């Protein structure tokens, strides 16, 4: 076995990737990422001990979040870049360890004597080959008990999603140290062999609580800078002229690209999870933000090859770039791929310098005109609140009989055609609530509207599942219900990676029951852990469209 990874929905044969990742990860990259997570756990051990002594290190706190984000599926495939992260992790671990020991001695008059896990001390100087070997030792399989392993991985993947949302918020200057501290609490707990199954279940539920907080923080970050999303029509065709395509999730990167291209005759397009950017007033004001090109991440090799412009990957999801466009794709932030040009991070409060991207776009000459339809987006919670009376009236009049939450991720699996078919076959009295790239399975279908309310209400990116939760809670209040599960809402969720795990844990924390999860159940859930989720939350796998549709319409 060269590697072991089962953190995403596409893991090989629904079990694990052990020779190479379906995502494109080679064993070296996979094992280095496992080592990075392990060292982050070691940092977290010291950081949680330090806070008990009144010591807190903001740089360490944020680094743990950035490090976790780096290990999410389809973020960083570059061993050298990951190696630099590991080197910095060792340095910060040494710093917080020293600060902890000094504070302990000052407070208690003796040396720190608590048992220290290996992850908090192991170090071999910068050698990727040695680090790779160590990474292979300390991954998921290092926990022998199947149920403890399952819960530790469920917790860790939830923490990765929380870290991603929190990191995005911090980039936009919205801070919540409590979330960063919980990331460390959770990571440190995975090193504690004294914890029981019940202890880990409690931590998993606590992760759901902090997933809600992280999504709320990012919602505040996005809306305070760019305004509340508005109902907006987005063009899906192309216009003639030089072009830049921005994929990923980072709105600040898009904003800086828009600023730096203003007046240069370059059209800017979004791709994938950047589609919701068009709904924000402070982004849609740029006239050269002209449309959304393509669909979700897994189609990028075909779509990028046909896009004769510069391409910027701001966060996940990147796939192996084809030679046909490798010289015109750029990574930035935490994203990395060997041999792909990288736009460095901001320094001294300035902007990133996207000059190489702009020059490449101008050099290429650009796109030809190609017609496309318009799609409607922008139904985040504030915008939805403005049409709430209309929605409530439609429900009371029987014109809307059920809402179906079909949020989450898209992916390559043929089984995901289920979501397209479900959208087509849902009766005209149903409304789909969506967020995340799962929307691309049905957002180009002509599903019509109900008294002017679109039958696909798109709240935004995957983190904007928070908006769907807020909307559901407002509807519960409006209808005078005691339980969110009494609403005429069914949950038919598609998952792919670790941010979706965080969203799932958030829904469970809020008490949502009866979630259908597809296209497959996570491989990292042991039979016993799955049994707990089924018994307590009625989680179930998707079945056939015919069977699930019948049950959904019955509220089951």
From Swiss-Prot:
GO terms of molecular function: 4 iron, 4 sulfur cluster binding; hydroxylamine reductase activity; metal ion binding; peroxidase activity
Pfam family, one: Prismane
Keyword list, A-Z: 4Fe-4S, Cytoplasm, Iron, Iron-sulfur, Metal-binding, Oxidoreductase
InterPro entries given in the database record: HCP/CODH, Hydroxylam_reduct, Prismane-like_a/b-sand, Prismane-like_sf, Prismane_a-bundle
Manner of cofactor binding, per the entry note: Binds 1 [4Fe-4S] cluster.
Iron recorded as keyword: yes
Keyword Iron included in the entry's annotation: yes
Annotated compartments: Cytoplasm
Xref: HAMAP family: Hydroxylam_reduct (MF_00069)
Cellular component GO terms held in the UniProt record: cytoplasm
UniProt cross-references to CDD domains, sorted A to Z: HCP
Residues modified as Cysteine persulfide: 409
Family label: Belongs to the HCP family.
Name by which UniProt lists this protein: Hydroxylamine reductase
Cofactor(s) named in the record: [4Fe-4S] cluster; hybrid [4Fe-2O-2S] cluster
PANTHER family associated with the record: HYDROXYLAMINE REDUCTASE
Gene Ontology BP term (one): response to hydrogen peroxide
Main function: Catalyzes the reduction of hydroxylamine to form NH(3) and H(2)O.
Positions that bind [4Fe-4S] cluster: 5, 8, 17, 23
Catalysed conversion reaction: A + NH4(+) + H2O = hydroxylamine + AH2 + H(+)
Enzyme Commission designation: 1.7.99.1
Positions bound to hybrid [4Fe-2O-2S] cluster: 249, 273, 317, 409, 437, 462, 497, 499
Gene3D superfamilies, sorted: 1.20.1270.20, 3.40.50.2030
